[in-house]
Swiss-Prot record:
It comes from Saccharomyces cerevisiae (strain ATCC 204508 / S288c). Monomer. Part of the heterodimeric LMA1 complex together with the proteinase inhibitor PBI2. Most of the thioredoxin of yeast is in this complex rather than the well-studied monomer. LMA1 binds to the ATPase SEC18. The gene is TRX1. This is Thioredoxin-1. Gene3D superfamilies: Glutaredoxin. The record marks 24 as: Deprotonates C-terminal active site Cys.
Amino acid sequence: MVTQFKTASEFDSAIAQDKLVVVDFYATWCGPCKMIAPMIEKFSEQYPQADFYKLDVDELGDVAQKNEVSAMPTLLLFKNGKEVAKVVGANPAAIKQAIAANA
């Protein structure tokens, strides 16, 4: 399951966890974001040891800017509040590899 962030504080709390947290930075107008969404959902089922979230860059632009996200989709992977991997673009193979390497 992929959970939608509503606030910056939800984001901050989630990434501080002692487990892998995968955040999909997307925009509703972004075609590649829509294309990759079902794959992210599938990865969330394949990797239950990780938590999966999505963040609308138009709703939480300050969070996107703070994390230097300028292209969508961008997936950031965090552990203990630190970024451990970044995948820019709709690249399922690279996303899966980043998750597997850090799960």
